[in-house]
From Swiss-Prot:
GO terms for biological process: regulation of DNA replication. GO terms for cellular component: host cell nucleus. It is found in: Host nucleus. Pfam families: PPV_E2_C (PF00511). Residues 92-108 have a biased composition (Low complexity). Keywords: Host nucleus. Plays a role in limiting the replication of viral DNA in keratinocytes. Recruits the host NCoR/SMRT complex to viral replication foci to mediate repression of both viral replication and transcription. It comes from Bovine papillomavirus type 5. This is Protein E8^E2C. Gene3D superfamilies: 3.30.70.330.
Length: 225
């Protein structure tokens, strides 16, 4: 006869002071586990959780922040995600005095330059007149030349005189014509008037500047009555 012995396993209990059914052995924390919190991290957006999981071993009980800040978020259905962001921050310093002065100066007109102020105070003593201050009868007597002819040729001569012989005369007018009885119809030839400081300058001008033969040159002197 064969005897078969059936061994019954010891009863398992679920007491807190037993491990795997062995009485007298208390459950100890697993090796490498760090401090845990009593409850889950609060699900507050944009606020770092102080204790996230049991995987942060070797930290002090205060669970200080690392260089990375972790923000918990809750999705629909109760699921949680962790979003890690860098702790870098940008510090904006105060505005410099130069930029503030620049913003203030845009609201007021610029002050005149010292050279411009001095130039406005200085009277014109030379016989040479400034631009916009042409005076045909300055001094009571002015030697001049009238050059008449075809309008286009007179204009070309005036352009050449201003470009190449500017130091040989005082002032020169634009090309002008006489007008008719009605409207602005031009009559006669185109004319320019050239003024000089004295008769000597006029003689030097006429002796050194070539004038086309089809243009007529008249020496005149303008004076007041």
């Amino acid at each position: 006869m064969k005897l078969v012995m059936l061994l019954r396993p010891p009863p398992q209990t679920h007491r807190a002071d037993t491990t795997d059914g062995l009485p007298g052995l208390q459950e100890e924390p697993r090796g490498g586990d760090g401090p845990t919190c009593s409850g889950p991290a609060p699900a507050i957006p944009d606020s770092p959780s102080r204790c996230l999981s049991r995987g942060f071993a070797g930290r002090d009980p205060g669970c200080h922040r690392n260089r990375h800040r972790v923000h918990p978020y809750i999705l629909s259905g109760g699921q949680r995600i962790l979003v890690t962001s860098s702790s870098s921050s940008t510090v904006q310093g105060p505005l410099s005095s130069g930029s503030s002065q620049h913003s203030q100066s845009r609201g007021r007109p610029p002050s005149p330059d010292s050279t411009e102020t001095e130039r406005a105070r200085t009277p014109v003593n030379s016989d040479r007149q400034r631009a916009g201050e042409f005076d045909l009868l300055k001094g009571g007597c002015r030697p001049c030349c009238l050059i008449e002819g075809n309008g286009n040729k007179v204009k070309c001569l005036r352009f050449r005189l201003k470009k190449s012989h500017r130091s040989r005369f005082l002032d020169i007018t634009t090309t002008f014509w006489a007008t008719g009885d009605e409207g602005s119809d031009r009559q006669g030839n185109g004319t320019i008037l050239i003024t000089f400081t004295d008769t000597t300058q006029r003689d030097l001008f006429l002796g050194s500047v070539s004038i086309p033969g089809e243009l007529s040159v008249r020496r005149i002197t303008i004076s007041t009555d």
